[in-house]
Amino acid sequence: MTLTNHILNISPPQTENQEADNGYCQYDEDFYNHYLECLGNYLLLSGSHNISLSNGRFQIKRDSYTHLQQQLEVQRMTEQDQVWDKDKIRQRHTKIIDYLMEIL
């Protein structure tokens, strides 16, 4: 049996709906240019987990992030408002870079 992992965009390239309640920030030009492919917007998941989540609402994704520390980190970061936005992506990006610089 082979276990396959995927790198998931927490904010997907396309969402199933563009309503404000989908749990993501507005996808403006700044978001596409600086946040969509940002390290802080990536998450490691099993292949089957990634496929099951697709481009769905953030709340559904968030509730499924229960296995790895990095998944639990996203849950903790969104406890108050349960929205994945530019500020949280930037915070997570900085935290990952700081950690990498510390161990290198």
Predicted regions and their residues:
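Flexible coil/loop and intrinsically disordered segments
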Residues: 1-104
